[in-house]
Amino acid sequence: MTAASRANPYSIVSLEEDGLHLVTMSGANGFGNGKVHTRRRCRNRFVKKNGQCNIAFANMDEKSQRYLADMFTTCVDIRWRYMLLIFSLAFLASWLLFGVIFWVIAVAHGDLEPAEGHGRTPCVMQVHGFMAAFLFSIETQTTIGYGLRCVTEECLVAVFMVVAQSIVGCIIDSFMIGAIMAKMARPKKRAQTLLFSHNAVVALRDGKLCLMWRVGNLRKSHIVEAHVRAQLIKPRVTEEGEYIPLDQIDIDVGFDKGLDRIFLVSPITILHEIDEASPLFGISRQDLETDDFEIVVILEGMVEATAMTTQARSSYLANEILWGHRFEPVLFEEKNQYKIDYSHFHKTYEVPSTPRCSAKDLVENKFLLPSANSFCYENELAFLSRDEEDEADGDQDGRSRDGLSPQARHDFDRLQAGGGVLEQRPYRRGSEI
């Protein structure tokens, strides 16, 4: 097969001609799986971080006719400047059209000729030229009514044109007001106040590897019936040799259990359990560094004020997924309310105890899980929060030298020694949602 025959993007190319580099990962100590990895240029995003789809239409037959057939949707979808320009031109065209008609009527009736007597009544009073006819057209359609120019009973066609212009003016006004109101009430801009974390993370949750990302609502108004979904997009070659450039695979975020429906009052971490049905089941940390895929995440719901459905989108490339990280807490309890600190929304911290193997190898017990009592960032934050509460109460006598209260020091020693699981106690802050 020659290089020219492989110019087709759907043809199968060899590794040498495509510029791919082979890297073999060792399987020792759980840091590899013995697979052959390839490093290649990352493909373009299908969905940008701001939610826009990275697509361009080409070679569309009868595109203009199809768009004009759905004029209302076209006016709602286009930019404000173009919509206002279209309506301004529509008003100007209607004024000019009927101005020309009234001028022609005046010419045909002889109203522009010098009057020899006072016995003839003109079709339109005080219309002696085109400019006067144009002004009469504007006064008729906008119902200004200065009182100088008016139609008479002399010409039936002039009366009919006044009625026709009034109807046309009402149609243009109604169409313009409807399009502007529909454009203003669209929930598209509501997605600007729905936030996705910059990165997704992979970490252990209840003994299982999970893919997690965070969503938040920057407004106090709620998103009714909010629910999330996700898809993995990557190229694939079928068993028959067919090349699918963007194969879409659903990622389960708890649809069967109802976990995909969320109460988005505070930032929430969305969780996808990497199990046998997950497309990420066989991907390890090394695979993640070399693989080429995109995870599209979607948040949908109804705007509380208008009950219209809105949708926010984002995506994560493989190099934007942090293996062995967790999100920092953003929800803290202070006095009689909860405080959300969005400065920590995108921040993560590393969990070194996260296994680097795939979930498949983890299920097959090839690698040991870290201790359930491992001391982590949330525990440290809880201890510090408890100390701050004790300090606010003025109880400083029983503190140890390192700044921890005796109870916090006791729990810390138990965690470090692996002596058991802490009993549940309410904390002032530091609880992640």
Curated annotation (Swiss-Prot):
It holds the Pfam family IRK. Induction: Up-regulated by triiodothyronine. PANTHER family: ATP-SENSITIVE INWARD RECTIFIER POTASSIUM CHANNEL 12-RELATED, INWARD RECTIFIER POTASSIUM CHANNEL. GO terms for molecular function: inward rectifier potassium channel activity. The chain crosses the membrane at residues 78-104, 156-183. SUPFAM superfamilies: E set domains, Voltage-gated potassium channels. Inward rectifier potassium channels are characterized by a greater tendency to allow potassium to flow into the cell rather than out of it. Their voltage dependence is regulated by the concentration of extracellular potassium; as external potassium is raised, the voltage range of the channel opening shifts to more positive voltages. The inward rectification is mainly due to the blockage of outward current by internal magnesium. This is Inward rectifier potassium channel 18. InterPro entries: Ig_E-set, IRK_C, K_chnl_inward-rec_Kir, K_chnl_inward-rec_Kir2.2, K_chnl_inward-rec_Kir_cyto, K_chnl_inward-rec_Kir_N, Kir_TM. Residues 105-129, 147-155 are extracellular. Keywords: Cell membrane, Disease variant, Endoplasmic reticulum, Ion channel, Ion transport, Membrane, Phosphoprotein, Potassium, Potassium transport, Transmembrane, Transmembrane helix, Transport, Voltage-gated channel. Residues 396-414 have a biased composition (Basic and acidic residues). Residues 1-77, 184-433 are cytoplasmic. Belongs to the inward rectifier-type potassium channel (TC 1.A.2.1) family. KCNJ12 subfamily. It is linked to Thyrotoxic periodic paralysis 2: A sporadic muscular disorder characterized by episodic weakness and hypokalemia during a thyrotoxic state. It is clinically similar to hereditary hypokalemic periodic paralysis, except for the fact that hyperthyroidism is an absolute requirement for disease manifestation. The disease presents with recurrent episodes of acute muscular weakness of the four extremities that vary in severity from paresis to complete paralysis. Attacks are triggered by ingestion of a high carbohydrate load or strenuous physical activity followed by a period of rest.
